[in-house]
Amino acid sequence: MNIVNSKILFLSFTLLLLLQSSIVESDSICLSSGVASTVAMAAPGSVQKGDEEWRAILSPEQFRILRQKGTEYPGTGEYVNFDKEGVYGCVGCNAPLYKSTTKFNAGCGWPAFFEGIPGAITRTTDPDGRRIEINCATCGGHLGHVFKGEGFATPTDERHCVNSVSLKFTPAASSL
């Protein structure tokens, strides 16, 4: 077997293991061992596009973060020190993700929220088990990571560390 075939086999096996071991959960969706519970919002993955379609509607930086799981530099995002009332949605598909009432200042350099809108966020444990990735449940866009037990005085003791580039803010007057 040549080296290219070996790498493809290794990557395929790794992906299979990740799919079998990943747990995706949110407030109104829980996928574990292939069994799904009730979904209150649009079904996960209901907005599906190829890379070329995403590139046509996203800026290069949005594509890098949402579709390639990138991270913006800390302190550079539009919504880090933003405190207006409204809803933060996915910049890729416009699905509502977070209410402004759940945003707090974690001092981490990225917008921080203590919970998402029920059914809007999926969670997947990274392969090394150290972090939990959060994605838009509707289009699968990468948002950032969630951290638990850091001692913040929030109702959930969770910090959703979200890339500003992944978000689109809608003021309260025209939001949900």
UniProtKB/Swiss-Prot annotation:
NCBIfam families: peptide-methionine (R)-S-oxide reductase MsrB (TIGR00357)
Compartments reported by the entry: Endoplasmic reticulum
Binding site for Zn(2+): 90, 93, 136, 139
Keyword Ribonucleoprotein in record: no
Protein name per its UniProtKB record: Peptide methionine sulfoxide reductase B3
Entry's Gene Ontology molecular function annotations: metal ion binding; peptide-methionine (R)-S-oxide reductase activity
Cystine residue pairs: 108-161
EC number: 1.8.4.12
Location of the MsrB domain: 51-172
Endpoints of the signal sequence: 1-26
Domain of life, source organism: Eukaryota
Active site: 161
GO biological process: cellular response to oxidative stress; cold acclimation; protein repair
Cofactor note text: Binds 1 zinc ion per subunit.
Disrupted gene: phenotype observed: Increased methionine sulfoxide content after cold treatment. Increased sensitivity to oxidative stress induced by cold. Loss of cold acclimation.
Keyword Endoplasmic reticulum: yes
Annotated family: Belongs to the MsrB Met sulfoxide reductase family.
Gene3D superfamilies: Peptide methionine sulfoxide reductase
GO cellular component: cytosol; endoplasmic reticulum; nucleus
Organism this protein belongs to: Arabidopsis thaliana (Mouse-ear cress)
Co-factor(s): Zn(2+)
Any Pfam family matching the protein: SelR
PANTHER family assigned to the protein according to its UniProt record, in alphabetical order: PEPTIDE METHIONINE SULFOXIDE REDUCTASE 2 (PTHR46081:SF8)
Keywords linked to the UniProt accession: Disulfide bond, Electron transport, Endoplasmic reticulum, Metal-binding, Oxidoreductase, Redox-active center, Signal, Transport, Zinc
Main location: endoplasmic reticulum
